[in-house]
Amino acid sequence: MLLFVSRRRAPVARPVRRAADASFPNRRRPAARKHSSMHIHILGICGTFMGGLAVLAREAGHTVTGCDAGVYPPMSTQLEAQGITLIEGYGAEQIDLKPDLFVIGNVVTRGNPLMEAILDRGLPYVSGPQWLGEHVLAGKWVLAVAGTHGKTTTSSMLAWLLEDAGLNPGFLIGGVPLNFGVSARLTDSSFFVIEADEYDTAFFDKRSKFVHYRPRTAVLNNLEFDHADIFPDLAAIETQFHHLVRTVPGVGRIVTNGRSDALERVLARGCWSEVERFGVDGGWQALPAEDGVPVDERFAVYSHAERVGEVAWQVQGDHNRMNALAAIAAARHVGVPPAQAAASLAAFRNVKRRMEVRGSVDGVTVYDDFAHHPTAIETTIAGLRARIGSRNARILAVLEPRSNTMKLGVMKAQLPASLADADLVFGYGAPTGRDALGWNLGEALAPLGDKARAFDDLHLLVKAVTEAARPGDHVLVMSNGGFGGVHQKLLDALGSRT
């Protein structure tokens, strides 16, 4: 029987078995499916997802080799430390390795020499997400975290909550949680936390990656338009999210952001699982713990108007409180009491490249952050402003808009508003190559007036930031790429000032 979920209301009861929180810590666990060892050769192995998959495959006992167009540290170093042989480029001669299976990353397209050889010879191949679903996730209790923003942070929180509760989860995350020091690991636990990406699976499978994961617990963190290179509009992404909803069993649970109209539209298309909302009255909420205590330092967790825990931590921002609520609600589904989960967040150390301090020189602190979508840029600046407190402390925002969506210019009009709370803005657009912008960054930043400047020369950008920075300033570098090592360049330049 199909259940349609109305806006901001709990699902109507149905004549099926209701999802229940797992007993904690003892309960019957599903047995993981076993697979015989094989040799897999991974195309596009140095990507975040495929590199993590390679580590999991190696830990599962498979022989793993791989290739990529850019074999360089830190991913190459991490993979080689796992005993994984890496090959530079996609030469067709790699079919002579004679693996049992080729695993294809979504960076690979038709025309790739090795892929063409695989197709011409009729050799077996599969996408990375499908291989993961069939060989790692099958038989496990999968906790998948989806959403436009906060996937990496929320996945890291959730993995930590299960770890601190003694559940020893496996995980695959699109960043490096500082509590673990690795982005992926395989354990004998029945629980597996995965960052569930909506980007497409492969050139031959245009569904979102997450349809392969079959979660029992699904977190829908938020939903905005993104990935303009593959999605024409928000409705197309909503369709993919509904595909994910369709894979959650009736005894599963969906934890969703009750503030998101887009996610409410997704659920209104049909939902067959129990739904819990966070961020709204009647669901999970983060409220002041007591009068006079900043909510960024300590907040109370409420579930259905009942106070169930308290979080004291060093992670700033309303967006991170929402991430925390999602993680606590998801952890409860596998049996972690909310009070225990809330207490565990005191030891959560966040994720590399999420407001990560790269160094401090001459009173100037340089941060690294992965923000590249206008919403993420705005919330990241707001989070740093909350951390440093005083308006006398300046934020110098250094931005490289290099995501596929940004390069297309779809969101350039939103940049000024997202950067408005920074004191100075330094934008960088590569003049040539794959990261070159197809639009004028200076014109896009013009509404910010004299406080914003655009550069197409990294050396000149570093020089300008160094000249502008003064003791007490905070330089916030935002990019979803390496940004030419600008963080260290800035620290070196600041250190050489006389």
Question: Which residues make up each language-model segment?
Answer:
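Short coil/loop residues immediately preceding or within conserved phosphate-binding loops
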Residues: S37, K140-V142, D296
